[in-house]
Amino acid sequence: MAAGAAVTLGGGLSACGSRGDVARAGTTDQWRQFQGATLNFISENTAPTAAIAANTKPFTDLTGINVNIVTLELTALVQRVALDLASGRAQYQVIYADPYQVLAPYQRGLVDLRTLEADPNLPRLPGGIGDFIPVQMDAAGRFVDPAAYYALPYDAPTMIWQYRQDLFAKYHDRMAHDLGFDPTPGGERTWEEYFRIAQWFNKNATSDVKYGTGHQARQHDSLMNDFSNVLWSYGGAYFDHGKEVGRLGARDPGPCRLDSEAAIAGAEFYNRLLSIADPASKTWDWDGVGAAFRAGRLAMCPNWHEFAASNEQVLPGKVGYAVLPKGPVATANMYGGTGVGISANTMPNERGAAWLFLVWATSPETQLANLKSKAGGGTPTRTSVYELPEVRAAEKRPSSMPNMLTAAAVRQAWTPERIGLRPKIPMWNECNTAIFTQLSTMLSGAETPANAMRSIKSRVDRIVARGWVA
């Protein structure tokens, strides 16, 4: 472990210290004014945090600040953060602020970072907030107020079409002849064509793969993500003004709209698609479908783009990446990114120290280092990093940064017309559980798609009607 960092997996902190503000040194060096301080960062166990935890020495050398990092599964993290914010103390000064389970429900417990960016005694963000990809800045950093921001974009997993390009090349002409269209994956393909491609592989390529497609359709958050891409492409929405509710959020989103004809049509297609997918799809989350794809079981799957690095280790040169297909109305690629924020319970100087960490952790230099890290990595959230010559070069094989092989696909996926944003509402966690539970019932055959959508609407409306107090 690098000097200056202590990582605790699923446990408590080392060196929490007594409650009291950190000292501020009399120095003109903005980066050294809180030397000797210790920060506690609580994060989900993600790729960028793994990379940072493996190498916090540059931050400690720059600032004199030590960092303790606690990594937890997301549900446990949310519980720990909620308790810490309610306590009035800041055991964790730096918080991995999941937009849907931390930012939306607990926004009042996070610092409006504009106050720190405007402080002349603190370093400014290199490139300002304008260097962050705009839709990510809104989705991961803001809640309701379009001016305030409570987190800086930190990671950006996004669902895209992952496919065996070696098999698509091998069978291209036969598929094109049999199907009557060019099967090459891309945004011009439709979900109906995706279905037919999967069906073709099921019938004609069993010597290479067992199934044409696989999905993260376990009764889990992954099922909501996988379904939502189809829902939105068919014109369905969870609530009115779905793009706005996803991008900036809402405290009261109004009635659920999953009983609409468009939503039901999307559910009917999704149910039909899963009927020809690998049957094990109903037991897989994103890790499960990713492992099955790497094992050579599937010709293609929708999955998070950050699986590219592990794909390249197992299937070097054999995997292609594209945006997800379009539906009758739209196209959507689910975004799962998160920001890092600062607890509003922090005292003035420890708040300043936490700001130094946020500026460093999201800086272009650190994001580039994370891309190269053997411990993790993720993908950058800043436009300037994607413009660096060495990052551009890594978009093509052979690549020293294999997640960059997805760059062309995710750049398209992050445009406002293609990005898929789930509702950013305070009660989303409970709504999400209702959604994936009922979807799982539908996939089991115990409920029709229409009845499943109506059941979800009824449950979500009751959840939203109760409101949220934090």
Language model feature labels by segment:
Residues G317-L324, K372-T437, T441, R466-A470:
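Long, aromatic- and glycine/proline-rich binding clefts that accommodate carbohydrate-like moieties
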Residues A25-Q33, P99-I160, D226, G320-A322, ...:
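Hinge/lid segment of periplasmic solute-binding proteins
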Residues Q35-T46, I65-V70, V94, Y211:
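Short, well-ordered beta-strand elements
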Residues M1-G17:
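N-terminal export signals
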Residues K57-Q136, K170-H172, A176, A292, ...:
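Extracytoplasmic "Venus flytrap"/periplasmic binding protein-like
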Residues T46-N66, Q162, D166, I435, ...:
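Short, polar/charged alpha-helical segment
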Residues W191-N202, V230-T283, L324:
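Glycine-centered hinge/linker elements that transmit conformational signals in sensory
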Residues N40, A86, F143, A147, ...:
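Extracytoplasmic/periplasmic substrate-recognition and gating elements
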